[in-house]
Amino acid sequence: MVNLNGIPPRGKRNYYLAIGLEGSANKLGVGIIKHPVLEKHEDSDLSYECDVEILANIRDTYVTPPGEGFLPRDTARHHRNWVVRIIRKALTEAKIDDPTKIDVICFTRGPGMGAPLHCVVIAARTLSLMWDIPLVGVNHCVGHIEMGREITGAKNPVVLYVSGGNTQVIAYSEKRYRIFGETLDIAIGNCLDRFARTLKIPNAPSPGYNIEQLAKQCKNKEKLVVLPYTVKGMDLSMSGILQYIDTLAKDLFKKNLKNKLLFDSRTGEQLVTVEDLCYSLQENLFAMLVEITERAMAHVNSNQVLIVGGVGCNVRLQEMMAQMCKDRSNGQVHATDDRFCIDNGVMIAQAGLLEYRTGHFVKDLSETIVTQKFRTDEVYIAWRE
């Protein structure tokens, strides 16, 4: 059994308050949540009985012009300019007049982009010193998983973590989130974002979302553009697919009539549209994700899938995963909307507060060093059986 009342709340209250700061990429988020103090059981307290009340979930995104990505230094400048305003807005929305009543400050320790991570941890350290509140450094992926579990009610699913910087298939075992499969090169979100740059489509609200909308407009869904399909056991590779479809898109824009895949060799008629390329890319990438996820489900004998991360908002990915689960003894797919799929401060507060309640928190500021590389399976999950 897991005791989640290991550390009592401040002021002898019957609830805990946590603030979470997320800024590992171009999204800066601040979330504030409340946990109840659990009733005592004969053995101890069970982690799944911990109901979360979301008091604030504020976010701002650094958006670049079409055709451009976001550089670490520019993203960090955005975070520095906005972090104080967003923290104040979150406190106001949560109706917290005295911040010293907060039990713990949670921040993203990694993985992520170095400069933005440093901006967030500096803000967290400052608040900790000002308010005399302990700190907890949170693994970004674990934050996604714990928020997804809480929102959807998934018990012990296979987790598909798909975002701009990560692509992993994960399952819980013996106090760790074990990685069963992952990308061998670039993440799926990075693949979609870079193709969006080639197409020079807007980055707002996100490149992947705009590719999804173009894919929906495809009028020739019966005939896919043939793309590389690279699955190696439980792992997958997407750099070759990106390079290939980038070349096709550039030939399409240049009207390279020598490319017989895009143009009729006799008449010069265009055979493929930008919408066709977006649709085929999605179908190809998502089929690879479904394959390795199903393989993990068979390995751990699970019939549930939890999709987390920014790409998890994609409706087509959810549909394909749902069809696979339906074919596997009426399995279930769990996913959240963009409030929780996309990076946010609430997920950091959730994972951090669970860690804090089991007695794990930063004892000295020297322990708050952020890292760009922080594996999901490095974290000891003390709050689960």
Curated annotation (Swiss-Prot):
Cofactor(s) this protein requires: a divalent metal cation
Cofactor note: Binds 1 divalent metal cation per subunit.
Residues bound to a divalent metal cation: H140, H144, Y161, D343
UniProt keywords, alphabetically: Activator, Acyltransferase, Cytoplasm, Metal-binding, Nucleus, Transcription, Transcription regulation, Transferase, tRNA processing
The keyword Metal-binding belongs to this UniProt entry's keyword annotation: yes
UniProt cross-references to PROSITE patterns, sorted A to Z: GLYCOPROTEASE (PS01016)
Main location: cytoplasm
Entry's EC annotation: 2.3.1.234
One MF term in the entry's GO annotations: N(6)-L-threonylcarbamoyladenine synthase activity
GO cellular component: cytoplasm; EKC/KEOPS complex; nucleus
Residues annotated as binding substrate: Y161, V162, S163, G164, G165, D193, G208, E212, N314
Keyword S-adenosyl-L-methionine: no
Quaternary structure and interacting proteins, as annotated: Component of the EKC/KEOPS complex composed of at least BUD32, CGI121, GON7, KAE1 and PCC1; the whole complex dimerizes.
Function noted in UniProt: Component of the EKC/KEOPS complex that is required for the formation of a threonylcarbamoyl group on adenosine at position 37 (t(6)A37) in tRNAs that read codons beginning with adenine. The complex is probably involved in the transfer of the threonylcarbamoyl moiety of threonylcarbamoyl-AMP (TC-AMP) to the N6 group of A37. KAE1 likely plays a direct catalytic role in this reaction, but requires other protein(s) of the complex to fulfill this activity. The EKC/KEOPS complex also promotes both telomere uncapping and telomere elongation.
HAMAP family in UniProt: Kae1
Name of the protein in question: tRNA N6-adenosine threonylcarbamoyltransferase
